[in-house]
Amino acid sequence: MIQSKRQQGASFEYQARLFLERQGLTFIAANQRFNCGELDLIMQDQQTIVFVEVRQRKNQIFGSAIDSVDWKKQQKWLDAANLWLAQYDSSLEDADCRFDLVAFGATTNDIQWIPNFLDE
């Protein structure tokens, strides 16, 4: 059965969630949409809110999953996180948060987790 891109994305996001939960993170929310962008996963690592971007690439013709998170995507990620935090009377300036990337290759077994991706 052929999956749509949305179904494939949801599948990889779910696999990323399970992976992060095995690493000790707690699930908060998924697919939080704002005008500026979407937050794939929101997790918690002890007291830290973790905004997770999930990326997948079947091949590297146009670059890796990691390479696909360009400056424009990073800005949308930051803006969406700030809007999510604002719902709780918080902001990036005062919240204990970080931005992690979970990147998949062709399969869910080919996974790379990069904590603090935006600090790299």
Swiss-Prot record:
Listed Pfam families: UPF0102
GO molecular function terms noted in the UniProt entry: nucleic acid binding
SUPFAM superfamilies given in the database record: Restriction endonuclease-like
Domain of life: Bacteria
InterPro entries, A to Z: Restrct_endonuc-II-like, tRNA_endonuc-like_dom_sf, UPF0102_YraN-like
Family stated for the protein in its record: Belongs to the UPF0102 family.
Protein's recorded name: UPF0102 protein HSM_1206
